Amino acid sequence: MIRRTLILCAVAALSGCGTNLREVGKEPSLSPVGSGIDGGNTSALYKYPEPPRAPVKKFSLWDDRQSRLFTDPRALSQGDILTVRIKINDRANFKNQNDRSRTANRKLGFDLSAQWDKWSTAGKGAGALNSATDTTADGEIKRSETLELNVAAIVTDVLPNGNLMITGSQEVRVNAELRVLTIAGIVRPADIGAENTIPYERIAEARISYGGRGRISEIQQPAYGQQVLDQVLPF
C-alpha cells in the first residue's frame, strides 16, 4: 500500500512539471492568437457576424473600407503588408505587506452526581483548548522595460467581421548573436494610419517576442541538467 502511494505521488509530481520540462533549454512559448477571447478557443474568432455588404459603384474612387480618399491604400486583404510600430516603456513597482494574527481560547467543564439506593456516583470533568496563529507576508516587485522597434507584418487572414490577422518576424545577426523579433495579433482596418502603419497598442491579442539565439544567450542560460533539477526536485 505504501509503495503504491509513493508511486502515485511521484507520477503526480512529474505530471505537474511536465509542461515546464518541455521548455528546458528553450524560451517560453507564446499562446496562440485568439486564445484569450473565449477560454482558449481560437475558433471563436470566426463566429463574429459579417458586416453588411456595401453597394459597389463602378467608376467610383470611394471605398467604404478606406476612410481616406486622398491617401495611399492600406492593407486590407490577405498578402498585404503593413508596418507595426512597437514602443514599449513600462515601469511597474508593486509592494504588498500583510499581517494576520488570531487567538482562540475554548474551555469546557461538567459536573455529574447521582444517588440511588445507597449507591452514588460523582464525577467532574474539565477541558481547555487554546490556539494561536500568526502570519506575516512581505513582497515587492520592481520592473522596467524599454523597447522601440518597427517590424513589417503580413496579413494572413481576414475575419468575417473584416478584422485582419497579421504576423511578422525580423531577424538581425550581429557577430555570433541572432536577434529575433516576432509580432502577431488582430488589427482593425480603421486603426491603420495613412502611412500604412499601426501602433502596437491598437493590436488585439498581441503576441510580441523579442529574444535571441547565439553565444551570449547560451552563456546566460543555466545548464540543461540544472534546469531539469530545478523543475523536478520538490525542495
Swiss-Prot record:
Keywords: Bacterial flagellum, Cell outer membrane, Lipoprotein, Membrane, Palmitate, Signal
Residue numbers with lipid attached (S-diacylglycerol cysteine): C17
GO CC annotation: bacterial-type flagellum basal body, distal rod, L ring; cell outer membrane
Lipidated residues (N-palmitoyl cysteine): C17
Assembly and oligomerization: The basal body constitutes a major portion of the flagellar organelle and consists of four rings (L,P,S, and M) mounted on a central rod.
Function: Assembles around the rod to form the L-ring and probably protects the motor/basal body from shearing forces during rotation.
Name by which UniProt lists this protein: Flagellar L-ring protein
Lineage, opening ranks: Bacteria, Pseudomonadati, Pseudomonadota, Alphaproteobacteria, Hyphomicrobiales
